[in-house]
Structure formats: C-alpha cells, structure tokens
Amino acid sequence: MTKLIIHLVSDSSVQTAKYTANSALAQFTSVKPKLYHWPMIRNLELLNEVLSKIEYKHGIVLYTIADQELRKTLTKFCYELKIPCISVIGKIIKEMSVFSGIEIEKEQNYNYKFDKTYFDTLNAIDYAIRHDDGQMLNELSEADIILIGPSRTSKTPTSVFLAYNGLKAANIPYVYNCPFPDFIEKDIDQLVVGLVINPNRLIEIREARLNLLQINENKSYTDFNIVQKECLEVRKICDQRNWPVIDVSTRSIEETAALIMRIYYNRKNKYNK
C-alpha cells in the first residue's frame, strides 16, 4: 500500500482538519495514511516546533489557523519544501465573504464563543447521560429523539454523538419478555427511532462483552432465538406506529447518527412549513 503522511495543524482541537482528512482518505483504499496531530498552535514558537517536524517528515499539510502571520509562515515554509499546504476552511470563508459582501474580520479571538449553540450542546450531553438505558422516563417529553432497540445496538454512543450535535436523545433498551415502557402507547411528538441489527452480529458483540466482563452465566443474552425475537419485536413495535427503523449491522455510529439527523431535520422542516 502507498504510504501517505498528513500533518494536521490547528490553533484549536484539530478536529476539523482530522474529519476532513479522514473523509478524503475514505476515497483511497490503497493508501496507508499516517496522521500527525498538532493542536493549539497559537504562537510562532509553537509553530516553529511543528515546522521542524514537517521538515523531518514531509507530507501534506492541512491547517485551520486564524492568525494571518502564522498562516503566512506555514504556507511559505511548505512552498519552499514543495509540499502541499491546504487551508481546510479558507476557501469556504472566502466564498462566504464574496457572496455576502461582508469583509472577513481581521481581529482574531482565540476565546471560544460561549453562545447558545455551545450551551445547547452541553445540555444535550447532560440529557443523554441522564437518560441513558431507560433512565428517567418521566422526562422523555424533553427529548428531541428517542432511540429504542435491543441491548448492544449502539444506542448509547449514538445518543452521545447526537448530543454533540445539539440534539437531546434518550435511549430505551428492549429486553425479551420484559414489559416495555407505556410511553409507546401515547401520542408523542418526539422522533422515535428503532435500532436493530443482524442477530448473528449482535450475538458476536454480546459474547465479546460478556468475555470482557468475565460473565458466563447469562445464556439467554446470546441465545439466537431470543436475540432474533428481540430484533423482530422492535421492528414490530416501530412498524405499528410508523416509527423509522435503522439496521446498524454495517453502519458506523457516525453513519447511524447522520441518518437519524437527516430523518429528524426532514421531519422538523416538514412541520415548520
């Protein structure tokens, strides 16, 4: 496989550059990437340390840096080394400025903007944690999204991922032969999404979990017939109420969350017309 070195340079957490790089790398199956992360680069001293690393290991540079002088230093250095140096959001900012007729602000402020979006995200994360695994069902009316599904169908990480996108998500497990919360009999406004998975895949995940916890007694947890019935019952519950169902067998958490968000915003846009 072809090796590819990528330096991610940022004056903050480097996540924007990282997500961009990984999205691009997904298009190259024959590439073996090596990503170097350089976060919180906010002065020339720190940047010079990074430049020495880049000089030692040549590769593509992706950056998100607000300070103009630091950007100039970085791009000039890469130009002299004849290596690509790409601003992840530079072109986007420029096009926004041209289209809107608004000048790019010259003053740079490294303090995070504690706006409504920031606090909405914090509240959503807190909500996801407090309403994980069927907890505090009396507060489901506060949720934007409710996830239901058998154990180990990625309900918790999906809820947290949704929370990082500002959406309050509660999740409720479905356990075979156990009564399901009576909220499903009520007319609710929240988006309810069922998560199911291929039974064989779910058994593999559950067995790995039990081995990790060194538990051998819970045979029904990995019994194929029971696992299959759990998934079928979740589908039945959702189908009867016109709730969407997502099969997570081959989906990453990010993909599952993205699909849920698409359903959520399509639904919201429809009702807001």
From Swiss-Prot:
EC annotation from Swiss-Prot or TrEMBL: 2.7.11.32, 2.7.4.27
InterPro entries per UniProt: Kinase-pyrophosphorylase, PPDK_reg
GO molecular function: ADP binding; ATP binding; phosphotransferase activity, phosphate group as acceptor; protein serine/threonine kinase activity
Source taxon at top rank: Bacteria
Binding site for ADP: G149, P150, S151, R152, T153, S154, K155, T156
Record's catalysed reaction(s): N(tele)-phospho-L-histidyl/L-threonyl-[pyruvate, phosphate dikinase] + ADP = N(tele)-phospho-L-histidyl/O-phospho-L-threonyl-[pyruvate, phosphate dikinase] + AMP + H(+); N(tele)-phospho-L-histidyl/O-phospho-L-threonyl-[pyruvate, phosphate dikinase] + phosphate + H(+) = N(tele)-phospho-L-histidyl/L-threonyl-[pyruvate, phosphate dikinase] + diphosphate
Kinase keyword on record: yes
Statement: the UniProt record of this protein carries the keyword Kinase: yes
Entry keyword set: Kinase, Nucleotide-binding, Serine/threonine-protein kinase, Transferase
A family per Pfam: Kinase-PPPase
Record HAMAP family: PDRP
Family under the similarity heading: Belongs to the pyruvate, phosphate/water dikinase regulatory protein family. PDRP subfamily.
PANTHER family given in the database record: PYRUVATE, PHOSPHATE DIKINASE REGULATORY PROTEIN 1, CHLOROPLASTIC
Protein role: Bifunctional serine/threonine kinase and phosphorylase involved in the regulation of the pyruvate, phosphate dikinase (PPDK) by catalyzing its phosphorylation/dephosphorylation.
Name this protein carries in UniProt: Putative pyruvate, phosphate dikinase regulatory protein
